[in-house]
Amino acid sequence: SQVFRRYTEGKKGWKRPLLFVQFAGVAFICGLMYVVMLQYYYVLNKDLGYNPKRVVVANTGFGNKENQDYALTFFRGLPYVESVSSADSHPVYSYSGTMIQDESGQSLFSSRFCEMMEDYPKMMGMVMKEGRMPRNENEVAINETYGEWMHWGTELLNRTVYNSGYVCKVVGVIKDFRIGNFTNPQAPFILMSTKNFGNCVHVRLKEPFAENLQKLNKVSADAFPDKTVDFRS
């Protein structure tokens, strides 16, 4: 009997470390899941500096000014469209780069840049901190980070931007917004104005979102059969 008891207790002995390892593993996995949930919550609630809700985009061009005006009027007239505008790209896709120089032509740094229609920042919920939108090719708006990189202090308006051979006047300052994903550091940014509608068309839909997106793609295919107009979120 005593031999059997010692044998049984011996068999139980090796289970205790195993049980500890199992509990430690479960605790580690739970902790990891908690961290992931916190990161997910952070991403969902992080201020992007613009409002992407119910915004869909399609990359397409409409040719001459008459066709552009027709397309813009068409999209604005759809009952399930809240607002529409266009730009070179969407913030999450990032933007092209341009080299910034000083007065002597010495390269300073690379800045992101984008051409936008005048109503685009308002449509996207971007904030113009001071000044106004550019109105011609000799004017630009910059973000806060651009001013910081240039060491301009708080006086940003009426400064001169030397942009890859172009000499432009700063007429507006836009609040920093997220360019690319959350792993990308905040980049300097130049905003230029365009009157052309197309390239990256942005549409903010009304609810119900999924149903209205299907409607939008259907009527777009019918209205522009010679083009690929595929809106996506």
What is each of the regions a protein language model found here?
Residues 9, 63, 89-91, 133, ...:
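Residues that form or immediately flank small-molecule/cofactor binding pockets and catalytic motifs
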Residues 66, 70-83, 144-148, 164-233:
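"Rare, low-scoring activations can occur
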Residues 41-108, 113-114:
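Membrane-proximal extracellular/periplasmic loop immediately following the first transmembrane helix
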Residues 9-10, 47-50, 131-133, 153, ...:
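Short secondary-structure boundary/capping segments
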Residues 1-61:
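Alpha-helical transmembrane segments of integral membrane proteins
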Residues 56-58, 100, 140, 161, ...:
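Well-ordered beta-strand positions enriched in small/hydrophobic/aromatic, beta-favoring residues
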Residues 110-187:
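Hydrophobic secondary-structure segments that place a key small or acidic residue at a functional site
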